[in-house]
Amino acid sequence: MSNVTTPWWKQWDPSEVTLADKTPDDVWKTCVLQGVYFGGNEYNGNLGARISSVFVILFVSTFFTMFPLISTKVKRLRIPLYVYLFAKYFGSGVIVATAFIHLMDPAYGAIGGTTCVGQTGNWGLYSWCPAIMLTSLTFTFLTDLFSSVWVERKYGLSHDHTHDEIKDTVVRNTAAVSSENDNENGTANGSHDTKNGVEYYEDSDATSMDVVQSFQAQFYAFLILEFGVIFHSVMIGLNLGSVGDEFSSLYPVLVFHQSFEGLGIGARLSAIEFPRSKRWWPWALCVAYGLTTPICVAIGLGVRTRYVSGSYTALVISGVLDAISAGILLYTGLVELLARDFIFNPQRTKDLRELSFNVICTLFGAGIMALIGKWA
C-alpha cells in the first residue's frame, strides 16, 4: 500500500477553476498560473547538444578565466597595458550587471512578494528576498572590514591601493622576456619597453614586503567575489541540463555569459601578487570556476527526466542562492570594484585619457551583460 500523500493543492482541477471563483484562493491560482502547482518536467531531448555543453562551457569558462593570468604571469609573453585594463574594467562592468540583471531580478522572480513562493507559508509573512540580499551584503561588508583591520593592525598596511600601486603590480606580474635575454640586451628586469608606439611592461620578481602583506587583504576580497559567482553558476548548470524548449537559445547565451564572468574574475585575480609558495592558487581558483557550471550541467543531465526547475523546492533553493549571490556581488561590484577604482582613487585625474578608457570599458561590460540578460 502506497504511503505517498497527495498534495493538498491537487484537490482542485485547474481546468474547472476560473479567476472569478472565490475558492480556491488567489494564492493557489497564482501558483497554478506560474507553473509551480501541476508543473512538470520540461526535458525534450537534444541529449547530444546538452552533453557537448559540458565540455564547451568547461573549456570556454576556464580559458577566459585563465587568459589574464596567462597574459601577465607566463614568461616571454608581452601584452599592452591597455589590453589588461580592458579586461579588468570590462570585467567590473560584467560583475555589476550580473548582480542586478542576472541575480537580483531572478531572485525576485523566484521568491519575491508577487510569486507563488513569496505568498505562501512563512515566505508570505515578510519580504525575505531583499532581507536575504541585505544580510548577504552586510556579511560581505563585515568580512571586508575585519579583514582590512586585521591586515592593517598586523602589518601596518592599508587595504586601499592607489591606481599607481595597482599598475605597479601589473608591471611586476606582466611577464616578458626572461632575465637572461634582458641581460643580453642590456636591460633590467621590470623595465619599460616601447615598440611601434605601443607600451609594454616586463616581468620582475617582486619581493617587497608590501606586496607580500597586501596579498592577505586582496585575496580575501577576491574569495568573496568568486564565491558569489560560483553560487550563481550552480543553478545555471542545473537548469541548462534539464531545461526544455529554451535550451537552443540558452546554450549559446550561457557560453558568452560564463566567458565574460570568467574574464572579470581572471582580471581581478591577475592583479594579486601571490607568495612563491602559493603560486598555484590562482590557477586552482580559475579551474574551480571553470568546473562549477559543467559539473552542475552534468548533474542536471543525470536528473533531466525528474528535475522540475519550476517546482516549489527548486524555486526556493534558486531564489535563496541568487539573493545571497546578489548581495555579495552588489557590495563587491559597487564598493570593491567601482568605488575603489574610480571614486576613491586619488590618481584617477592624472591621465584623463586612461580614465575615459576605463569608464568606457566598464560601461561596455555592463551593457553587454545586461543585453545577455534578455535571454538568460
Swiss-Prot record:
Where are the residues of the annotated region Disordered?
177-196
One family from Pfam that matches here is Zip
InterPro entries the UniProt entry points to: ZIP, Zn/Fe_permease_fun/pln
- Localization per Swiss-Prot or TrEMBL: Membrane
Q: Give the Cytoplasmic membrane side ranges.
A: 72-80, 144-216, 264-278, 332-354
Bias regions of kind Polar residues — which residues?
177-191
Q: How does it sit in the membrane?
A: Multi-pass membrane protein
- Swiss-Prot/TrEMBL keywords: Ion transport, Membrane, Transmembrane, Transmembrane helix, Transport, Zinc, Zinc transport
Give GO terms for biological process.
zinc ion import across plasma membrane
List GO terms (cellular component aspect).
Answer: cell periphery; endoplasmic reticulum; plasma membrane
* Keyword Transmembrane set for record: yes
Please provide, alphabetically and separated by semicolons, the GO molecular function terms listed in this UniProt record: high-affinity zinc transmembrane transporter activity
Q: Where are the transmembrane segments?
A: 51-71, 81-101, 123-143, 217-237, 243-263, 279-299, 311-331, 355-375
Statement: the UniProt record of this protein carries the keyword Membrane: yes
Q: Which family does it belong to?
A: Belongs to the ZIP transporter (TC 2.A.5) family.
Miscellaneous notes? Inhibited by Cu(2+) and Fe(3+) ions.
Q: What is this protein called?
A: Zinc-regulated transporter 1
**Species for this entry:** Saccharomyces cerevisiae (strain ATCC 204508 / S288c) (Baker's yeast)
